[in-house]
Amino acid sequence: LLNRIDEPATGRVLDPMFHADIPAGRLAQAKAAGSILGEQVWRQFPWIGCSHGEAGQAHAMPTTTDPVEGILARTWRPALSVTGAAGFPSIDSAGNVLRPKTTFKLSLRLPPTVDGELATQRLKALLEADPPYNARVSFNADWGATGWDAPETAPWLARAADDASRAAFGRPAAWMGEGGTIPFMNMLGARFPRAQFLTTGVLGPRSNAHGPNEFLHIDC
């Protein structure tokens, strides 16, 4: 069933409905950011490595080490994750028996211009249609949210960002999207279609709004 959603060898999501055309401006921003960050785009993550044998220095690798492709994969390409599972016995009680049912919790990241509700309906149809071996398959969605693609940056805001970046870092500002949904931004964008947005927040140590290590570390 999961192979209906993505390729098991590459992780590429198959259905065109989950994809979106990448705007030329966003592609240019990703190229500029990639040229600055280089391998930091993927080396910043704690890759698991082996500590024994001939492959003692080997570690897991991302699907791409190209900085630009890494940025686009996080922001403008869909990706499927299995975030939970139920119905499997623990190892100490597992036996050679059939399970009555198996449950997976899935997370499908979408490009910001893909409609979250329509994508949820499509995902349900893909998983429930023609079950293999006459199995019973059911899909229940928690929620499907549409991402947010910020409007084109006004010249005055771009100048302000460049001035601030030059004052702090000696270089003009660079732009890079982030692969996460903040539904409130869509609400604000719909309510104020001509507004410019500068969305930021500084969270101190251990604030951890959504995860165990979510805060900004700012060198002073």
Model regions: which residues?
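Acidic-enriched catalytic cores of C-N bond-cleaving enzymes acting on peptides and small amides
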Residues: 1-89, 114-134
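Active-site-adjacent substrate-binding region
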Residues: 3, 9-10, 152-195
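Zn-dependent metallopeptidase/amidohydrolase metal-coordination segment
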Residues: 76, 98-102, 171-220
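Generic structural signal for residues in well-ordered beta-strands
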Residues: 82, 136-141, 173-175
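Short, glycine-/Ser/Thr-/acidic-enriched flexible segments
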Residues: 87-90, 109-113, 144-145, 181, ...
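Short beta-strand/turn micro-motifs at beta-sheet edges
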Residues: 91-96
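Hydrophobic residues positioned within well-ordered beta-strands of beta-sheet architectures
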Residues: 104-106
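A short beta-alpha structural unit
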Residues: 108-112, 138-154
